UniProtKB/Swiss-Prot annotation:
InterPro entries (alphabetical): ClpP, ClpP/crotonase-like_dom_sf, ClpP/TepA, ClpP_His_AS, ClpP_Ser_AS
Recorded name of the encoding gene: clpP
Subcellular location field: Plastid, Chloroplast stroma
Reactions listed under catalytic activity: Hydrolysis of proteins to small peptides in the presence of ATP and magnesium. alpha-casein is the usual test substrate. In the absence of ATP, only oligopeptides shorter than five residues are hydrolyzed (such as succinyl-Leu-Tyr-|-NHMec, and Leu-Tyr-Leu-|-Tyr-Trp, in which cleavage of the -Tyr-|-Leu- and -Tyr-|-Trp bonds also occurs)
Protein name as annotated: ATP-dependent Clp protease proteolytic subunit
Domain of life: Eukaryota
A GO term for molecular function: ATP-dependent peptidase activity
Function: Cleaves peptides in various proteins in a process that requires ATP hydrolysis. Has a chymotrypsin-like activity. Plays a major role in the degradation of misfolded proteins.
Subunit relationships: Component of the chloroplastic Clp protease core complex.
Length: 216
């Protein structure tokens, strides 16, 4: 049976006793966000709103975005990516499970040197697709033209942030390309593989990662 959102004890600063609150509310307080579903308007508004709020609340401390998503809507993914580049805090992107399609684009959008893939994560990139391929011919042609512009823009971002030539990324995006964490690092999609670096930084810099993750 579904158990709903787990609750955990959390003591609000100034209170003597802890209260039981939703897990995700605690994570948000620790500046930790989750993208664990298909990318649609609702989750996009949720994540971008939290990023903006956390940036206003504290423009210095890092934000951590965990990703386990099969991808989703093109424009929604671009909205998250653009918000990540706009807010003042650095954003760690951490892939666990899978980051496919637009989710890999969001993973790529993390602060350079702060993009992480867990050892058994899978990353997939491919070209954007249209949802209107059954439209009438004039509408379809307009959609294809717009899709071509968006594809070129996304390809340029991949090329810029991975250091790969534009033509290499363009050819790779012609098909579904699945990568292991090590392959994604070699490609330039992520900077760190595994949790060894997390453990290292947690031991030496208590501020580097949220307190709750030190015992992982």
């Amino acid at each position: 049976m579904p158990i709903g959102v787990p609750k955990v004890p959390y003591r609000i600063p100034g209170d003597e006793e802890a209260t039981w609150v939703d897990l995700y509310n605690v994570m948000y307080r620790e500046r930790t966000l989750f993208l664990g579903q298909e990318i649609r308007c609702e989750i996009t508004n949720h994540i971008t709103g939290l990023m903006v709020y956390l940036s206003i609340e504290d423009g210095i401390s890092d934000i951590f975005l965990f990703i386990n998503s099969p991808g989703g809507w093109l424009i929604s993914g671009m909205a998250i990516f653009d918000t990540m580049q706009t807010v003042t805090p650095d954003i760690y992107t951490i892939c666990l499970g899978i980051a496919a399609s637009m989710a890999s684009f969001i993973l790529l959008g993390g602060e350079p040197a702060k993009r992480i893939a867990f050892p058994h994560a899978r990353i997939m990139l491919h070209q954007p697709a249209s949802a209107y391929y059954r439209a009438r011919t004039p509408e379809f042609l307009l959609e294809v033209e717009e899709l071509h512009k968006v594809r070129e823009m996304i390809t340029r971002v991949y090329a810029l942030r991975t250091g790969k030539p534009f033509w290499v990324v363009s050819e790779d995006m012609e098909r579904d390309v699945f990568m292991s964490a090590d392959e994604a690092k070699a490609y330039g999609l992520v900077d760190i593989v595994g949790d060894e670096m997390i453990d290292k930084h947690c031991d030496t810099d208590p501020v580097w990662f949220p307190e709750m993750f030190k015992d992982w």
